[in-house]
Amino acid sequence: IMPTLARFELEMHERVERGEGLAADLMIERMADLFAESYGGEMSIDRPRVGITWATFSHLYSDYYVYQYATGISAANALSQRILAGTPGAAEAYVRFLSAGSSLYPLDALKLAGVDMATTQPVEAAFAVLAGLVDRLEALVG
């Protein structure tokens, strides 16, 4: 559901940036289209019920909140990979990150642990892990 919500949110912001209006019927239709596309032709959906998701899903009340899942997963992957790889000082840096609590902005706290979310590296590394898992799954199912 999150990729569908992210696409919807981006499209609605782009419409506003182009000076186009938003109306409930348009938003319902677009949300239903995105869910239908995501589920594929094998599954039928109740378009009015699924289409109104945008109005009932609180994640969409904060700008680009849904995208924070992807960045959070990427950061967590980067933190764990440093520790699992035995990177010297990684565990201690992770403890410093945790100890910072809310005393630092999240991006600054992550830098304490050796993760720079201002670069593409953490997201690229997360995709590499995902690609490896897909490869393993494909090998299992033949």
Q: What kind of region is each of these model predictions?
A:
Residues M2, A6-G142:
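C-terminal, non-catalytic "cap/extension" segments appended to globular domains
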